[in-house]
A protein has these predicted regions:
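Short, linear, compositionally biased motifs with a strong N-terminal bias
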Residues: 10-11
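C-terminal motif of bacterial Sec signal peptides marking the signal peptidase cleavage site
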Residues: 14-15
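Amphipathic beta-strand/beta-sheet edge segments enriched in Tyr/Trp
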Residues: 106-130
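Short, conserved beta-turn/loop elements at beta-strand boundaries and strand-helix junctions
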Residues: 93-102
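C-terminal partner/receptor-binding element of secreted or periplasmic proteins
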Residues: 121-164
């Protein structure tokens, strides 16, 4: 009986390990540490806000975003109004997850991309999210890129590190 439990556990763990991918279009791809997130054009931070929201490749607001499609917000420490100039941010880690918005019907799927700036910009992270239900799945990096349009782009390291 113990051998059966051990074998089952090993099979389960090996199946999970195989769910890694180097393909950004895959559900199993995680943005690797050391990647670059480039802001390609000026981004406005609204008055009394510490973030900007991007969806469908355009700047929007929290009230105007469509929660059931992928949307991303760049979180900063200081309040606007102000403009963030184009620059490259380094990815220090990422976290994928989900939490209930209205149990048992609405889930929030999210990816948090923690960032640093060599220019001293007070960036904290980019959070991309989408609402769905239990039958939905987490969005891909390609979905994030579509939501960001030409505002942001990713550059991934040549050798993908399996750590986040």
């Amino acid at each position: 009986m113990n051998k059966l439990i051990l074998l089952t556990t090993l099979l389960f763990l090996s199946a999970c390990a195989a769910m890694q991918s180097d393909d950004p279009d895959s559900l199993f791809f995680s943005i690797p540490k050391g990647s670059t997130l480039s802001l390609n054009k000026k981004l406005d931070i609204p008055h009394n806000e510490t973030h900007a929201v991007i969806q469908y490749g355009k700047e929007t607001t929290d009230n105007k975003r469509h929660d059931y499609d992928v949307n991303c917000r760049l979180n900063l420490k200081e309040f606007g109004p102000r403009t963030i100039e184009p620059e490259n941010f380094k990815v220090t880690r990422t976290e994928d997850g989900q939490n209930w918005i209205s149990q048992p019907s609405i889930l929030r799927y999210y990816t948090e991309i923690y960032l640093t700036s060599d220019k001293g910009t007070d960036v904290i992270k980019m959070v991309c999210q989408e609402y769905g239900d239990q039958t939905d799945y987490h969005f891909t990096v390609e979905d994030i890129e579509v939501a960001l349009g030409d505002y942001f782009s990713f550059t991934f390291p040549e050798k993908i590190d399996s750590g986040k």
